[in-house]
Amino acid sequence: MKKVLLALSLVSVFGAVNAAEVAPVVEKQTCEKAVYPKSALMNEETGTVLLSVLVGPDGSVVDSKVDQSSGSKTLDKAAVKIYSSCKFKPAMKDGKPQQAWAKLEHIWSLS
């Protein structure tokens, strides 16, 4: 039986962040558990999904999109679902929460 490896990689915000700005940070413990989709597992699909997630000032996900597909629509949709369930520490500018895009990577791997 194959061992399933899921890797969550974190976050950088588009553009430069200066000392007065802080990027959004995912609170991993709030995310839906990453479960390898059955059909992708049966078809031995793997890959890396690059996502953009728009985080609101309250830390909730406002929008998300796939920037680069894993090559599997099933894995892409599952990654979007996982990160859409997460809460984030919002981006901060001058001590105030801001809406900002974050870039995330999710690696789906069988080993």
Which positions does each model-derived feature cover?
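Sec-dependent N-terminal signal peptides
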Residues: 4-13
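Hydrophobic alpha-helical membrane-insertion segments
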Residues: 11-12, 67, 104
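Sec/Tat signal peptide C-region and signal peptidase I cleavage site
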Residues: 15-19
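Short proline/glycine- and basic residue-enriched helix-capping loop/turn segments at helix->loop/beta transitions
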Residues: 20-52, 78-111
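Soluble non-cytosolic domains of exported or imported proteins
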Residues: 70-77
